Amino acid sequence: MVELSGRVGFLHDGSLSGEQRAAVEWLGGTGADAETLSFADLPVAGGQFDVLWWHRDAPVDGESPLAGHAGEIEGFLASGGGLLLSLRAMASVDALGVETVPPDVVDTDGVAEPSGALWRSLYDDHPAVAGFDSLRIPVCDHGAVGVARYESVLPARGEVLASTVRGGQDVPEEKTVVGWDANPGAVIGVGAPLSFAEPAAEGVTATRNALTSGCLAALADGRRQPSRPRDADGMAALRARLGDADGRPSYHFTAPANWLNDPNGLIRWDGRYHVFYQYNPAGPFHDTIHWGHATSDDLVHWRDEPVALSPSPDGPDRDGCWSGCAVDDDGTPTLLYTGGDGRTQLPCLATAADPGLRSWEKHPDNPVIEAPPDGVDVLATDHWEAEFRDHCVWRDEGRWHQIVGTGLTDRGGAVLLYTSADLREWHYEGPLLVGEGAGDTVWECPELLDLGESRLLHVSNYENVVYFLGGVEDGRFRVDGRGTLDHGDFYAPQSLTDGDRTVTFGWLPEARDVAAQWDAGWSGALSLPRVLSTGPDGRLRQRPAEEVRRLRAGQMLDAATCSVSDGERRELPVSGRSLELDLELALEDARTLELSVLESPDGSERTTVRYTQEGELVVDRTEASDDPGVTADTQRMAVPPYDEPLSLRCFVDSSVVELYANERHCLTSRVYPTREDSTGVSVAAEGGRATLSSLSAWRLADGYRY
């Protein structure tokens, strides 16, 4: 347990509860220089202490009892003092002037199993947890305990240090430990069930004591608390802090840390590419969604920008700023996004407030559509009054058009069409397309693209990204063909028109358990930029954008050739975790040809890409990782027999394998090799002879600019 070097004042409002007496008794037993201090004595004696600790278990009726002493607390912090607020006391941060957004859950938890703090790996060097070798810190194992936490909202000024672990289960959406940098002072709030009155198992008692001592010591030592980055330099420092931890890709875009999902608001403005994305600054889990932001001059080298959109505590996006798009409204960059509030999700508008698109002004009359259309049986679920979200907007024939993703009760997924003269008043035109599927299906993140000879409509149906090729006639989509955009770990893509090409990015979700994502400190990546088009046969084409070649940092092979016989495996003179492989394959008389990447020297760990005589391209993940917590299923896509010989581009990036077959078919897979030496590449054949008529390989460089 950390030794306390400073003087601690235990705050109370005149009398001590049983819980408070137990905390004082524990504090005295640590040998700390400590004494109780009533609120009334704060003006006279508060300055004698290095740390003030308010530990309150009882409910607060009305105004916080410490609110009348906010001035003394402010002065104490201004002189460099530290303040610890535990249990329900953390709910008073707004009354004390520390925070503008208080915890949204203040309650009594019935604790029946070891529960406590789920510490963020990003801050595993925080002095409060210096004595721990685990991020999971139980502090209570039974009893009814008063708690405070952030669930649907985040503190505006503070930084989340920990969420909740309960009975061995991570509960990241319950955020219970927060730090505030009140330079030169500091505040730590511990709303977890930090109970001293109830006896606990020896191990739980030890971790409770160590965490409390650690927080008090960190505050007594005058350590500044971590703060959420507010500018580009801060975001870059955040990225550098996490580094390439736990398989983080180096040239596929990821958030600086924490959570990333759907790409949003893709736009080229003043010659620069902007990618916004769904981002949670509180950790690597889906909750309290903001819009992250990055810029690039070439689509492959990125610079982190400040968070662009944050939920407004009293607005229609209180619970999250969800997916949407960006358009140029006569010279004004404009976002249309889904705002979440309780069980409601509706479209909101924001306009750029600076040329760099770093700050945005939300429309005062948001939401711009106040309800789903009358007479349409939009699906309702346990989570939402109406599944009605995600927006694609374009201008045609002098009017704005918008499609919204939804599901129709007993019918399936659907895309609804609206029109507007000004982006603010919208008229419902009817369903653009309704699926033929299960009645509980929702089509998310719809997008309608103009590919010249054809229009492409794609939707994400919780599992895959389905696309339809055809045209729009009288406000309805005519389907001429359909397919799957990517047959692997790929979801919710969004596109931008860049001259005469359509460039698309998709979200690459993780394929490992929640605990592994938490421990890594990051989650989610974006695909490489893809150019979508149709070929002379009217079928969809997909290829990496030409700019991807700019990542090439050194060539390992140049149009090499080799053949492999039945049962033979040949190691190639290529290795690494950031690679591009460009191959021409022919099965000859073999049943299969295998390309293995991220392979250990003994072959026990490898990701195998298998091309079969039946016209399938398969990613076999059964040996891809020694980690039992990752997904190990096999992914496959049809590659029609006339595609032989096969042209294959394979991009390897730590935990990403992204495949392009004949510029038509895509499969992106998430894999997590555990061995440092799993960097090899080999080929093998079964059932006969196979040939690589051309093989080129490059090492690829990092995709970030600081």
Stretches found by the model and what they are:
Residues M235-R239, V466, V472-Y491, L496-Y706:
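Beta-rich accessory regions
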Residues S296, A352-D354, L417-L423:
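Conserved Ser/Thr-centered positions that define the repeating blades of beta-propeller domains
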Residues L11-L16, F39-A40, W54-A58, S86-A89, ...:
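Structural motif
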Residues A58-C140, L211:
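A glycine-rich, often tryptophan-bearing local segment used as a flexible ligand/cofactor-contacting loop or short
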Residues D262-A282, P306, W322-T351, V368-I369, ...:
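Hydrophobic core segments of beta-strands in well-ordered, beta-rich domains
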Residues E19-R21, E25, T30, D109-A201:
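Catalytic beta-strand/loop cores that center a nucleophilic Ser/Cys/Thr
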Residues R228-N264, G283-H286, V300-D328, L357-R395, ...:
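Surface loop/turn signatures of beta-propeller and other carbohydrate-active proteins
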Residues M1-V51, R224-P226:
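Aromatic-Pro/Gly-enriched surface loop or interdomain linker
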